[in-house]
Amino acid sequence: MTRHGKNCTAGAVYTYYEKKKDTVASGYGTQTVRLSKDAVKDFDCCCLSLQPCKDPVVTSDGYIYEKESILEYILHQKKEIARQMKAYEKQKNSKKAEMEELNKAAKESKMKAFLDKEMTIVSKPLNPFTRKSDSGIDAAEPSCSQQSSEEKNKQLPSFWIPSLTPEAKTSLVKKPDKTVYCPMSGRPLKMKDLMPVNFTRVDEKVDRVGLINRQDRYVCAVTRDMLGNSVPCAVLRPSGAVVTMECVEKLIKKDMIDPISGDKLSERDIIMLQRGGTGFSGSGVLLQAKEARPVMQA
C-alpha cells in the first residue's frame, strides 16, 4: 500500500471507521464516551448533590444520599405526582361531562324525531313497498349525507394552526404512578427505608470543613483500615457503622454479631456500599456513558 492509499478518501466502500468518525462529527446515532476519574464521585458523596455528606443515609441497595437532599427529592416527586393526578382527574371529569352531553343530545334528537313523525299529517296511506322519500314525508328535509358534508366542511384542517393540522391529536394524560422511585436504582423508595450511616473519621479532632479538604477522610470502624473508592465496604444496619468487606468476610460473618452495637446480624443487615470507582476498568464500576440520539438511515 502506498503512502497516499492509507488516507482512503476515494474508496468505493464506506468503512466502519469512517462511519464511526462521521457519527461523532455529525451527532447522529448513539454517542458513547469513556468516563475518567474526574467524572467519578467519591464513595462517601451524595448521589444527588455529588458532595460529601453531612448527614448521610443509605438505601437497601447501597446508594448514599444526603438526608436533606433525598427528603427534598421525595417531597418534589410527591408534589409532581399530585399535580399529575389533579390533571388526570380533570381530564376524567371532562370526558364524563362530554359523554353526558352526547347522551343528552342523542335523547333529544330521538324525541324530536318522534314528535315530528307524530305531528306530520299524512295525506295518503303509506305503502310498505315504496321508499320513505317517495311518500313525501322527508322531501323538504336535507339528506344525512348533505348534513355530514356541511359539518365536515366546518371542521376542515388548517395547516397554519398546529392544533388543527391532520396529524394533531389530543394528548391523553395517563393515570400517574403514586410510587416514588430511587433516582439511582429505579426501585420503590420510602422514607422508612433510609438508614443513617455513621462514618469513623481518621482524626476526631478535625472538623468537617477540614475533613472535606482531605483525600483520606474515613477508616473502618473495626480494623481502622483506610476507606476509599478502591476498597469495597459495607454498612451494618443495627449500628450504621461502615466496615470493609474484608472485615465482614474474615471477622463479622463468623459470629454474625454487630461489633459496635452487639446486635445479631443477618445477611440482609449487611449492605454493600455502591462505590464511585477508581477510573480503571477493573474497579467493577461502569465507566462508559451512552446517549441515544436520532439515527440517519440510508
Swiss-Prot record:
Q: Which Pfam families match?
A: zf-NOSIP
PANTHER family, A to Z: ENOS INTERACTING PROTEIN, NITRIC OXIDE SYNTHASE-INTERACTING PROTEIN
Database matches in InterPro entries: NOSIP, Znf-NOSIP, Znf_RING/FYVE/PHD
E.C. number, please?
2.3.2.27
**Record function comment:** E3 ubiquitin-protein ligase that is essential for proper development of the forebrain, the eye, and the face. Negatively regulates nitric oxide production by inducing nitric oxide synthase translocation to actin cytoskeleton and inhibiting its enzymatic activity.
So what does this thing catalyse? S-ubiquitinyl-[E2 ubiquitin-conjugating enzyme]-L-cysteine + [acceptor protein]-L-lysine = [E2 ubiquitin-conjugating enzyme]-L-cysteine + N(6)-ubiquitinyl-[acceptor protein]-L-lysine
Say which family it is in: Belongs to the NOSIP family.
Chief place where the protein resides = cytoplasm
Instruction: Enumerate the UniProt keywords alphabetically.
Output: Cytoplasm, Developmental protein, Nucleus, Transferase, Ubl conjugation pathway
Catalytic EC class: transferase
Q: What is this protein called?
A: Nitric oxide synthase-interacting protein
- What molecular function does GO assign, one term? ubiquitin protein ligase activity
Which SUPFAM superfamilies did the record assign? RING/U-box (SSF57850)
